[in-house]
């Protein structure tokens, strides 16, 4: 199977890296940024035109800006399978843009680069395409109407979580730890906590670590005073508002 990436931005690059070696060929296009050439050189693919992708690709990964859909769709006429990662573009509009094709709406996150991503999907796809997506992480089938809300959580969350890790590591360094040691401790703690959260509810984990009158309790009280929970709620709401214009 040959895959064609129409658009070679950060998210497309993350997915392509996660898929390295899993396709017979990788084709990349861009709008003149040079990213397609860079990705092709990095991953052993080819930088080509959208028309070339339409001729050769078995699966098209649509990763352009949403406003570019009407411009690129005619260049991809006749393609048989399309997976779109365009934010805020509903399945119905995608199906209208690619009549006769199997169209799948996908919202991945950057964890796909290391095959630990979350991918929300809706629409039609062959078992082969679904299996390829599953290589990149945890696939969840959701209603098309839920994509904006899901994106505000799983699509944006890696940045929010990375900010929390960065802040904790900086706090550790400010307290006297070597900065690299502080980062290592926080990153590994985050990874272990993520595994624990697979089998235990977040509230249970929080309570298990928090001894009455202890240092964790003091830290959580400080986070409450500074509005940590409200800040996350505000971040999700702001993300939704931006997506919806």
Regions found by a protein language model. Give the residues of each.
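Glycine-rich Rossmann-fold phosphate-binding loop(s) that bind the pyrophosphate
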Residues: 8-9
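Rossmann-like NAD(P)(H) cofactor-binding subdomain of soluble oxidoreductases
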Residues: 12-19, 27, 33-34, 38-119
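NAD(P)-dependent Rossmann-like dehydrogenase/reductase catalytic/cofactor-binding core
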Residues: 184-245
């Amino acid at each position: 199977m040959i895959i064609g990436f129409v658009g070679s931005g950060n998210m497309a690059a993350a997915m392509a890296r996660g898929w390295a070696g899993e396709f017979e060929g990788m084709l990349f296009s861009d709008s003149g940024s040079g990213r397609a050439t860079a990705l092709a050189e990095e991953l052993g693919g080819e930088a080509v035109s959208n028309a070339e992708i339409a001729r050769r690709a078995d699966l098209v990964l649509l990763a352009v800006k949403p406003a570019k859909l009407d411009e690129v769709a005619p260049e991809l006429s006749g393609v048989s399978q399309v997976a779109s990662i365009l934010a805020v573009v509903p399945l119905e509009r995608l199906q209208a843009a690619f009549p006769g094709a199997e169209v799948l709406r996908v919202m991945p996150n950057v964890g796909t680069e290391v095959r630990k991503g979350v991918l929300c999907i809706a629409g039609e796809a062959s078992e082969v395409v679904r299996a390829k997506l599953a290589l990149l992480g945890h696939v969840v089938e959701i209603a098309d109407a839920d994509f904006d809300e899901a994106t505000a959580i799983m699509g944006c969350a890696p940045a929010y979580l990375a900010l929390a890790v960065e802040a904790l590591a900086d706090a550790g360094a400010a307290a006297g730890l070597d900065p690299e040691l502080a980062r290592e401790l926080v990153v590994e703690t985050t990874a272990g906590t993520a595994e624990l959260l697979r089998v235990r509810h977040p509230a249970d984990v929080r309570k298990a670590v928090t001894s009455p009158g202890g240092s964790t309790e003091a830290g959580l009280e400080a986070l409450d005073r500074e509005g940590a929970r409200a800040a996350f709620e505000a971040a999700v709401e702001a993300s939704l508002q931006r997506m919806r214009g």
